[in-house]
Design a protein with these regions (language model features):
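N-proximal low-complexity "stem/linker" segments adjacent to membrane-targeting elements
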Residues: 1-27
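Short, charged/polar "capping" segments at the starts of alpha-helices
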Residues: 20, 45-51
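Short, acidic, metal-binding catalytic loop of nucleotide-sugar glycosyltransferases
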Residues: 27-36
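Short beta-strand/loop segment that forms part of the nucleotide-sugar
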Residues: 35-46, 61-67
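Active-site-proximal specificity loops/subdomain of glycosyltransferases
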Residues: 53-107
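GT-A fold catalytic core of metal-dependent nucleotide-sugar glycosyltransferases
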Residues: 101-142
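Conserved catalytic core of nucleotide-sugar-dependent glycosyltransferases
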Residues: 129-209
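A glycosyltransferase accessory/donor-loop signature
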Residues: 200-299
C-alpha cells in the first residue's frame, strides 16, 4: 500500500454554547488524529472565548473571514433566531451562514490542504483516525445512503434544483441521503461547484446565490454535485457512518452512556460517537458526563 502524502484537515463550526463539547472534541483529536490540522470557525463575538482551543494543531478562525463584507449580523434575535442581512439577499438564518462557511473554507484555510473532513462539535473520536479507511485508490470517501429519512429531503432537492438550474435529473437525487459525521469535501471539487453556482447569479457570486436559496443542505449539494455532475471525480461512495449518532436526552447518567458507547465501539466501522443535544435543556446529558463516559478511551 502506498503511503498517504496528501494534506487533509478537520473543520468544525462552533459557538459559545458548544465550547465545552468542542474542547472535548479537540482532546479526542489530539489523541487519535494528530498531526492533522483542525480548523475551528466561530462567531466573531466568541473568538476571544475560544482562544484556549487555539493550540497545537487546532486553529481558531472567525466565520466572518468567509462571509462577504456586506453581510451584517443583527445583534438581537428575531422569532428566536439570529439573522444576517445584506443589500443583495433575503435575511439569512445563522444555520445557513454556517453552511456557507463550510462551503467556503478553502478560500481561507492553508493552500496545501487538499481535502477537509467536516466534523461537528458534539462528536468525540474514540479510535485512531486511519486515512486509509477514507482514501482508496486516489479517491476520498463520499458518504451516501439509500436509507433516506431526512425530514427536509424535499426542500434540499428543491434547493439543488435552484442552485444548478435543474441540471441534475430528479430520480438521481430523490433516493439518496448524503448527511453524516464526518463528511469529506475535496478542494478541487468544491471550487468547481462554487464556480458553477456563481454562473447563474447576476453578480457572479456563489454566496449571494446560496444565501437566497431556501432551506439548502451543504452536504446534499456537495454530494449530488460530485455524484451527478462530476461523476464521482476524486470520490468513491461508502454507506458506513464513521460516527454513531446518539441522542443526548436518552441518557441520564455517565454509566448508562458508557455502556452504550462500549457497545458502539465494538463495531469496527465506528471511530467515535456523535452525541447530539436537542433543545439544550436540563434533560440533556452534560458534557462532563459525556467526558466521563469516554474516559477509558481518552486516557
Amino acid at each position: 500500500m502506498k503511503s498517504f502524502n496528501k494534506k487533509i484537515a478537520f473543520v468544525t463550526q462552533s459557538y459559545k454554547p458548544d465550547y465545552d463539547a468542542c474542547k472535548l472534541l479537540c482532546r479526542s483529536l489530539d489523541k487519535f488524529a494528530s498531526p492533522h490540522r483542525h480548523y475551528i470557525f466561530v462567531n466573531d463575538e466568541d473568538y476571544g472565548y475560544f482562544q484556549a482551543l487555539h493550540y497545537g494543531n487546532h486553529i481558531v478562525m472567525k466565520k466572518s473571514t468567509v462571509l462577504p463584507w456586506y453581510f451584517f449580523r443583527l445583534p438581537f434575535k428575531l422569532l428566536g433566531h439570529h439573522f444576517y442581512l445584506s443589500p443583495f439577499t433575503f435575511p439569512m438564518r445563522e444555520w445557513v451562514m454556517q453552511q456557507m462557511c463550510k462551503l467556503g473554507v478553502f478560500e481561507v484555510i492553508d493552500n496545501d490542504i487538499e481535502a477537509v473532513f467536516h466534523i461537528d462539535s458534539e462528536c468525540v473520536m474514540l479510535r485512531p483516525f486511519n486515512i486509509n479507511n477514507f482514501y482508496k485508490e486516489g479517491k476520498y470517501i463520499l458518504f451516501r445512503s439509500q436509507d433516506n429519512k431526512q425530514r427536509s429531503h424535499a426542500y434540499y432537492i428543491r434547493a439543488i434544483n435552484s442552485l444548478f438550474n435543474n441540471a441534475i435529473e430528479q430520480d438521481k437525487m430523490d433516493k439518496y441521503d448524503y448527511m453524516a459525521q464526518m463528511c469529506c469535501f475535496v478542494r478541487e471539487n468544491t471550487e468547481s461547484m462554487l464556480k458553477d453556482i456563481s454562473k447563474s447569479n447576476l453578480f457572479k457570486s456563489w454566496k449571494i446565490k446560496f444565501a437566497n436559496t431556501y432551506r439548502p443542505s451543504e452536504f446534499y449539494i456537495y454530494g449530488n454535485y460530485c455524484a451527478n455532475i462530476l461523476k464521482m471525480k476524486n470520490h468513491y461512495v461508502d454507506n458506513h457512518r464513521a460516527f454513531k449518532y446518539l441522542r443526548g436526552s436518552n441518557f441520564k447518567t455517565s454509566e448508562e452512556l458508557k455502556r452504550t458507547i462500549d457497545e458502539v465501539m465494538d463495531n469496527e466501522y465506528f471511530i467515535g460517537v456523535w452525541i447530539q443535544k436537542g433543545n439544550r435543556d436540563a434533560d440533556e446529558i452534560s458534557v462532563e458526563k459525556i467526558e466521563e463516559s469516554c474516559k477509558s478511551f481518552l486516557d
